[in-house]
Amino acid sequence: MFSFVDLRLLLLLAATALLTHGQEEGQEEGQEEDIPPVTCVQNGLRYHDRDVWKPVPCQICVCDNGNVLCDDVICDELKDCPNAKVPTDECCPVCPEGQESPTDQETTGVEGPKGDTGPRGPRGPAGPPGRDGIPGQPGLPGPPGPPGPPGPPGLGGNFAPQLSYGYDEKSTGISVPGPMGPSGPRGLPGPPGAPGPQGFQGPPGEPGEPGASGPMGPRGPPGPPGKNGDDGEAGKPGRPGERGPPGPQGARGLPGTAGLPGMKGHRGFSGLDGAKGDAGPAGPKGEPGSPGENGAPGQMGPRGLPGERGRPGAPGPAGARGNDGATGAAGPPGPTGPAGPPGFPGAVGAKGEGGPQGPRGSEGPQGVRGEPGPPGPAGAAGPAGNPGADGQPGAKGANGAPGIAGAPGFPGARGPSGPQGPSGPPGPKGNSGEPGAPGSKGDTGAKGEPGPTGIQGPPGPAGEEGKRGARGEPGPAGLPGPPGERGGPGSRGFPGADGVAGPKGPAGERGAPGPAGPKGSPGEAGRPGEAGLPGAKGLTGSPGSPGPDGKTGPPGPAGQDGRPGPPGPPGARGQAGVMGFPGPKGAAGEPGKAGERGVPGPPGAVGPAGKDGEAGAQGPPGPAGPAGERGEQGPAGSPGFQGLPGPAGPPGEAGKPGEQGVPGDLGAPGPSGARGERGFPGERGVQGPPGPAGPRGANGAPGNDGAKGDAGAPGAPGSQGAPGLQGMPGERGAAGLPGPKGDRGDAGPKGADGAPGKDGVRGLTGPIGPPGPAGAPGDKGEAGPSGPAGPTGARGAPGDRGEPGPPGPAGFAGPPGADGQPGAKGEPGDAGAKGDAGPPGPAGPAGPPGPIGNVGAPGPKGARGSAGPPGATGFPGAAGRVGPPGPSGNAGPPGPPGPAGKEGSKGPRGETGPAGRPGEVGPPGPPGPAGEKGAPGADGPAGAPGTPGPQGIAGQRGVVGLPGQRGERGFPGLPGPSGEPGKQGPSGASGERGPPGPMGPPGLAGPPGESGREGAPGAEGSPGRDGSPGAKGDRGETGPAGPPGAPGAPGAPGPVGPAGKSGDRGETGPAGPAGPIGPVGARGPAGPQGPRGDKGETGEQGDRGIKGHRGFSGLQGPPGPPGSPGEQGPSGASGPAGPRGPPGSAGSPGKDGLNGLPGPIGPPGPRGRTGDAGPAGPPGPPGPPGPPGPPSGGYDLSFLPQPPQEKAHDGGRYYRADDANVVRDRDLEVDTTLKSLSQQIENIRSPEGSRKNPARTCRDLKMCHSDWKSGEYWIDPNQGCNLDAIKVFCNMETGETCVYPTQPSVAQKNWYISKNPKEKRHVWYGESMTGGFQFEYGGQGSDPADVAIQLTFLRLMSTEASQNITYHCKNSVAYMDQQTGNLKKALLLQGSNEIEIRAEGNSRFTYSVTYDGCTSHTGAWGKTVIEYKTTKTSRLPIIDVAPLDVGAPDQEFGFDVGPACFL
């Protein structure tokens, strides 16, 4: 249990760590100052800063910056333990082993006789965790970890409501631990601590009731001063000040957020023609056509009734051997066959069942002393011996698994610097210089006199920007900014708990009949009709040509048994039979096996030499021979290619000084070279003549800060900052009074799928679907399934005797026979070999404790322990050893130039030239490279006060506000009628809180509103601590069966039931196979000592038997008494939402329920629209004072209200939820959030196709719900908001998504009169005919813009599309002209990408016709069904049709436009 002392100690340590961290930062900033180490002295002992020690067992002290801070250890109260003991050097008492409270002791009668050992009970439930053991001695300090990253900013000093947990009357302040920093990397393991004293073994206690809060501890010492906190949040804006003069232009603002998506672009150019599409779905049933030619033979009809018996046919050829039939029933036993040849000796049979216990034999002679048996099981633990002398230190164990990260330790002292790392690799090679011009071979001349100074070059480019000057002193506070824009409404709250079901409303009046719905989708194919009567017998046809060999049919039903055949040849060797009874003693055996191989004999004499062998294969090449003598000089080779520049050689020796050369002519100025490394400073040159004044250089680096200027005039208020993030929800207010009864909730989310229902009654046969398009001729089909077995024919005549079949497979071993009678006692055998060690005997009684043994040798290295619990925060360790050298550094810069080389060999002497005169001054050189950055200039004088700056850009969004104070208990409002959700209005300004009104009478229940959209999931709350168990609720009604949850943890075993009656002995099943080795069970308590059995003889090791048959299931035992209820298992994952159930029958109205707990605060709502700009306000009074200075050592909590002192104050109140209601609320919030989240995730993973949860395409729906029927569903191909979802028809057989036109049929009438009826041309219906229109899609009431966007996405996600159009005609040719036999008068179709689709031409742009009834002018109405199928999905849907054969007064037409289907 986390005691108050722990908390105070934790706070003390956290404060120390904060202080230390601040000191380290301070040390780093001013490292030049040498600060002497701070120490503390107590009782004559000196302690370093941050040392922690216990001067007495019940006191703990820390050295804090020279001050000793001590605190008392407060112990937990031990209940029911009169003889508590305080261990040596410890402060808190513990209860010795075996001592129980008086209530547990009962009087006992005389001890009865010892019963037989009972069977081993089932494994008991895990006991509750025992109490914490006595703390061990502190371990040696570990090496210091590396410094952690800086902690998060501390809380400001004015957040009292959040910190009121550590209240103390006497304290003027208290420091609060910051959140835990991330753990540093793991340090080296410290040396093992000294072993703690042996703890007493506590009896496992019952789980106790939660104890009352302990008494309040004494006041802790004042914490060290905290690190300066970050600046507090800005105060509330003051009233606007007077308008200041406009300031200078502000810095450029951050880039704005991305703009809204732009307007829809212009229509793109037509794409290339796509490939021909696939056939669309079948159109509605056409009118009857004229009888067609005979169709291709149809599929095989259902099996007819059996015909008359035919004449016997000629015997067919022998068929291929059929598959083995199913094993027939066992025939009657045949006559005994002749004895087969003796079989091979079988393998050793499985070990037989033990025979019945034989009579005890006479005592045998004393056997040879057996090898020591395996160690028996550990006996019961003896009483603890006296502690032995300390053993040798054991070998270091392997590192344990890393424990849970402990609280971070205090930072250790800084270790000494590591040794110098190895030198870095040599820097990269410099670029080679350009080749010099070849000099004349003269001796080097003496150094000439310096030439005249050249003209000053133009000024170089501006140097780099100087370092940023030190930060100026803060200017005066600016005017307060205008009030921030109103924050958006918060996100939607979590769904409240379900309200109690309201009474059912009265039935409404019957509505008027609705308008006729749109034409239904084609029904599913009807079931096959009943078999027709058999037709009259046809004439015998001519024999057909032999067909191809069919596939082997499935095996027919087994025929009747034939007569028994003659005995077959001896079968293959069967499996070993069951072990027979022991036979009589056999005759003496044959001589034994040959002995083991003898020792090798002595080597024989050397034999004569053999013949020469054949020449061997070519050997591997030999090693290289010695180098030959040097050959003569060869002719000079042709010059090679220019080689790469070689690496720089070692510097040569310095050459001798040459003679003075002739000055050369002045060269033209070279191009500006690359900037060289900074050279060493040269000697000071002669003072040159002053150069002309250069242009003004760039500004130098800013000098040090000048004296503080006068305060500038206040700047204009900055633009409004973005509203801060929504603060954490304030602490929950107390529960309100119960509100009136709520409306009946909407139907809950779809439940998990129920168990499959019973088969329903067969539905009526559906209407026959429209004819599908003709498919391409299929490949030859595989043999169909075998037809049902015909009636059994008359028994055939017996066939000829077949050849003996192959021996069948060996049958399974039969069941083992009953136990045989015990055989006669055999003669004593020869003395057997020494037997294996027998099984371990039963554990002997516990002996008295032995004398203390000698110290044993160190044991072997132990197995790796399991990860221990996280340790308490360790004390700071001593400084670590110097670390190993660091890794090699990065390559260093190129080194300085090497020393002068050795003297070179002297070149041939050149002719001495005449002395030249000094050259003229050359033209000015090009500007030199930018100079190195200059040192900062001296401080400039204080500048004049600047003019105020312009309004700054809006500040960044403020940090999340701290949780508000706990709200007052609210009054329940009247439930209003739930209206439809209104459009989101701009949020009004928040009014001041009015006084609570009087409680109104409960309102009438409003009608249920539509269910709101699901809120976004809230942020994941931190897991609450375990709450105390709530009161038991009333029993709920049985819910629908959920899906089976994950298997719960095994419940605690019930008590042992009464012994059943002894059953008859079952037949012994054969031994099952050895199971896998189970995990080692927990060690059970030692059973009582059983009577000692006689030592059995060691049995021989049998071979492993074959796996036996599965035994029969035993009878079901009587039910045991109910076990105690197990702990509640974790909630199963939320199942997928089931389909919406049918409405239930009306229940009787329930009683008015109490109001449920208020739902958790919802996540923030979507941001509201920006309000209109208000009028500019008048300038306000001066702004609020600036942010507070850094806080002192603690937080001043003296202004908090005095807490009631009747009960001890719970110091961890705000850290721990010990209040059951708080826990319940928290759990409710978490559960609600989890349910909402899992529902949303389930909806994303498995959409329902509803308007609220649309699928992306029908193909997605089919994959998620393969058993759903075809019909209308909602899809949202572009995802995002579901308000633009469209309703489509999903063909669940194929996964096609079919989008219907908004107007599926065009009236049949005369649409067009041509001015010149003889001149025929294609006329577009939507573009050129009066009253015509281009076809739009998406069903009634959908927004065409939404549909266009959704179709674009649907096309992208589809690979093929198809559509049908039916053209109704009267005296108008649609496709084939019967008079001419050509397609000149065929219709044109226009696709979505404005491409024309024709009846003939390029096959990728042609449609097909499945039915053509408009081929001539008959004066009657006909129709032609056009189908277009393509993989270029951008061509569909069709938006216009152009007939050619129209324009006369007697020519009429109309269309039916089918859906465009995408797959």
From Swiss-Prot:
Gene name of the encoded protein: COL1A1
Residue span of region Disordered: 98-1217
Residue numbers of 4-hydroxyproline PTMs: 189, 192, 195, 204, 207, 210, 225, 240, 246, 255, 261, 288, 291, 297, 306, 312, 333, 342, 345, 372, 375, 387, 393, 402, 408, 411, 426, 435, 438, 450, 459, 474, 480, 489, 495, 513, 522, 528, 534, 543, 546, 555, 564, 570, 582, 591, 600, 603, 621, 639, 645, 651, 657, 663, 669, 681, 690, 702, 714, 717, 723, 729, 738, 756, 771, 777, 798, 804, 807, 816, 822, 840, 849, 858, 870, 876, 885, 894, 897, 918, 927, 936, 945, 963, 972, 975, 981, 996, 1002, 1008, 1017, 1023, 1044, 1047, 1050, 1119, 1122, 1125, 1143, 1158, 1164, 1179, 1182, 1185, 1188, 1191
Span of domain VWFC: 38-96
Signal peptide region: 1-22
Entry protein name: Collagen alpha-1(I) chain
Location of the region described as Nonhelical region (C-terminal) in the Swiss-Prot/TrEMBL record: 1192-1215
Protein's organism: Bos taurus (Bovine)
Residue segments, region Nonhelical region (N-terminal): 162-177
Expression (tissue specificity): Forms the fibrils of tendon, ligaments and bones. In bones the fibrils are mineralized with calcium hydroxyapatite.
Modified residues (3-hydroxyproline): 884, 1163, 1178, 1181, 1184
Record GO biological process: blood vessel development; bone trabecula formation; cartilage development involved in endochondral bone morphogenesis; cellular response to amino acid stimulus; cellular response to mechanical stimulus; collagen biosynthetic process; collagen fibril organization; embryonic skeletal system development
Primary role: Type I collagen is a member of group I collagen (fibrillar forming collagen).
Extent of Pro residues compositional bias: 138-153, 332-344, 839-851, 995-1005, 1041-1056, 1176-1191
Pfam families registered for this protein in UniProt: COLFI, Collagen, VWC
Domain comment as written in the entry: The C-terminal propeptide, also known as COLFI domain, have crucial roles in tissue growth and repair by controlling both the intracellular assembly of procollagen molecules and the extracellular assembly of collagen fibrils. It binds a calcium ion which is essential for its function.
Motif (Cell attachment site): 744-746, 1092-1094
Family designation: Belongs to the fibrillar collagen family.
Composition bias, Low complexity: 197-216, 278-294, 317-330, 378-417, 494-525, 537-563, 572-591, 633-660, 695-723, 783-797, 810-837, 852-882, 930-954, 1077-1091, 1125-1149
Disulphide linkage map: 1258-1290, 1298-1461, 1369-1414
Ranges of compositional bias, category Gly residues: 349-358, 484-493
Basic and acidic residues composition bias: residue spans: 228-242, 1092-1106, 1206-1217
